[in-house]
């Protein structure tokens, strides 16, 4: 197996050892299968995974649509992490990204539950309550505008591509149908009808 030399390090110490200035490691390492020799120091795998993520991010950034509302590749990584957590249905990723891009451009709050859950940390018990949506944390996109301060998950290639190449859509809302897919709406009235149909 690996030589686990980073085991005693805190997250911040690990990032410092890797020469990174980020405060959180979430999302900075590309999820993939990495081959290594027995006894390889784990720091090398972290470095390889980080380099793989940065290479992908920078390639997508150089090829991006100039109209995207991201100030830098890290903001696109944050968006990709939200898309990753928001759906397990691959066909919906581009549309969900398109909705969030539209909301950012319109100055609307993202209002996405996975960011609230991430901000709750260990307080999350499997269900979000109304009070949780009103309790402000740096990650609560119901109480704060814009993107959260860091990624909330490790996005895969499909979520990264969705963040950089979102669907062109007029939709501003979506709701889970219960079968893993989402229903998209252009107006709040349409969205409320969809919520009545699929949730209530």
Residues covered by each model-derived region:
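Bacterial extracytoplasmic/cell-wall-associated proteins, especially those involved in peptidoglycan
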Residues: 2-9, 15-200
């Amino acid at each position: 197996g690996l030589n686990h030399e980073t085991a005693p390090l805190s997250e911040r110490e690990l990032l410092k050892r890797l020469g990174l200035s980020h405060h959180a490691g979430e999302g900075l390492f590309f999820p993939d299968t990495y081959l290594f020799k027995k006894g390889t120091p784990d720091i090398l795998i972290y470095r390889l995974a980080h380099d793989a993520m940065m290479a992908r991010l920078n390639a997508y950034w150089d090829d991006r649509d100039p109209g995207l509302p991201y100030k830098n590749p890290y903001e696109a990584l944050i968006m990709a992490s939200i898309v990753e957590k928001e759906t397990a249905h691959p066909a919906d990723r581009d549309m969900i990204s398109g909705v969030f891009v539209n909301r950012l451009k319109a100055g609307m709050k993202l209002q996405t539950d996975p960011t609230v859950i991430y901000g709750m940390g260990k307080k999350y018990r499997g269900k979000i309550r109304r009070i949780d949506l009103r309790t402000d944390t740096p990650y609560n996109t119901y109480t704060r505008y814009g993107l959260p301060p860091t990624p909330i998950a490790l996005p895969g290639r499909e979520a990264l591509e969705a963040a950089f190449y979102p669907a062109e859509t007029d939709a501003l809302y979506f709701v889970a149908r219960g079968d893993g897919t989402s229903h998209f709406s252009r107006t709040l009235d349409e969205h409320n009808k969809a919520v009545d149909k699929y949730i209530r």
